[in-house]
């Protein structure tokens, strides 16, 4: 099983998000391969859900396109099988609590283990609700990656950090996912509090879409997570592999401190 902390060892990590089955099964496989080849360090694969409470319009629309392709959780596992035939890039799932519950905690974790899906991000499962799932994931070596919001106080940060695995996902701004022109949260202070509570890497997501933003976040955190901007490229370019490669290379250069150009 991939140790997710290793993706942050040598440089600032670029983490991209795609929705499984958007616009179709084969295209998603090609997208993940393109991201991997261009320098992406980790891909979050979103399992389509009917009520994605953390996601903005861009990702909601992608979920609907995936549903049109009859993408189910089992079909997502089949998609990862196809991905694993072409790349060993680290993978995690972004999913919602009901999907994992309906599938069965142990069965879901076993599937993840067999495909080297190293972690889960479950936005609608707060720390207090994770007690039953967490031991099962620990047993199978699957990280439950927590989200920490700007509103989290010191005690909550410490409690979340104590149970965290893999890395900490810092939510840059309140609200749902989506690109933001300006991120005004005092992220430096928030990340400093997290670092006081844990040695796990910290990645910032929600709203990041331009290389200049990625470069700024790299001064604070160990990596950036880009979701809506990647999903938008997929929605507006078919096939999207070339534009995803270009975008990933530009973000990679920015994270490495080589440029801070913008994306149209």
Curated annotation (Swiss-Prot):
PROSITE patterns: TRP_SYNTHASE_ALPHA. GO terms for cellular component: cytosol. Keywords: Amino-acid biosynthesis, Aromatic amino acid biosynthesis, Lyase, Tryptophan biosynthesis. CDD domains: Tryptophan_synthase_alpha (cd04724). It holds the Pfam family Trp_syntA. It is an enzyme of class 4 (lyase). The active site is at 44 (proton acceptor), 55 (proton acceptor). GO terms for molecular function: tryptophan synthase activity. InterPro entries: Aldolase_TIM, RibuloseP-bd_barrel, Trp_synthase_alpha_AS, Trp_synthase_suA. Pathway: Amino-acid biosynthesis; L-tryptophan biosynthesis; L-tryptophan from chorismate: step 5/5. The keyword Amino-acid biosynthesis applies. PANTHER family: TRYPTOPHAN SYNTHASE ALPHA CHAIN, CHLOROPLASTIC, TRYPTOPHAN SYNTHASE, ALPHA CHAIN. Tetramer of two alpha and two beta chains. NCBIfam families: trpA. The alpha subunit is responsible for the aldol cleavage of indoleglycerol phosphate to indole and glyceraldehyde 3-phosphate. This is Tryptophan synthase alpha chain. It comes from Lactiplantibacillus plantarum (strain ATCC BAA-793 / NCIMB 8826 / WCFS1).
């Amino acid at each position: 099983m991939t140790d997710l902390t290793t993706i942050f060892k040598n440089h600032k990590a670029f983490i991209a998000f795609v929705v499984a089955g958007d616009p179709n099964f084969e295209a998603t496989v090609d997208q993940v391969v393109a991201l991997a080849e261009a320098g992406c360090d980790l891909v979050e694969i979103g399992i389509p859900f009917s009520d994605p409470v953390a996601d903005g319009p861009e990702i909601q629309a992608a979920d609907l396109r995936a549903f049109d392709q009859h993408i189910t959780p089992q079909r997502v596992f089949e998609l990862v099988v196809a991905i694993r035939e072409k790349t060993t890039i680290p993978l995690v799932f972004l999913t919602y609590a009901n999907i994992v519950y309906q599938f069965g905690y142990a069965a879901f974790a076993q599937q993840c283990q067999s495909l080297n899906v190293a972690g889960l991000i479950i936005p609608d499962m707060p720390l207090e609700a994770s007690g039953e799932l967490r031991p099962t994931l620990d047993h199978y070596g699957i990280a439950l990656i927590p989200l920490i919001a700007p509103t989290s106080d010191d005690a909550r940060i410490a409690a979340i950090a104590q149970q965290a695995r893999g890395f900490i996902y810092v939510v840059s701004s309140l609200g749902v996912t989506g690109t933001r022109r300006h991120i005004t949260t005092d992220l430096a202070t928030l990340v400093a509090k997290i670092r006081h509570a844990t040695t796990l890497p910290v990645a910032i997501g929600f709203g990041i879409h331009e290389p200049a933003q990625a470069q700024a976040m790299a001064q604070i955190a160990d990596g950036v997570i880009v979701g809506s901007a990647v999903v938008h490229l997929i929605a507006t370019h078919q096939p999207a592999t070339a534009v995803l490669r270009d975008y990933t290379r530009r973000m990679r250069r920015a994270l490495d401190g080589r440029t801070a150009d913008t994306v149209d």
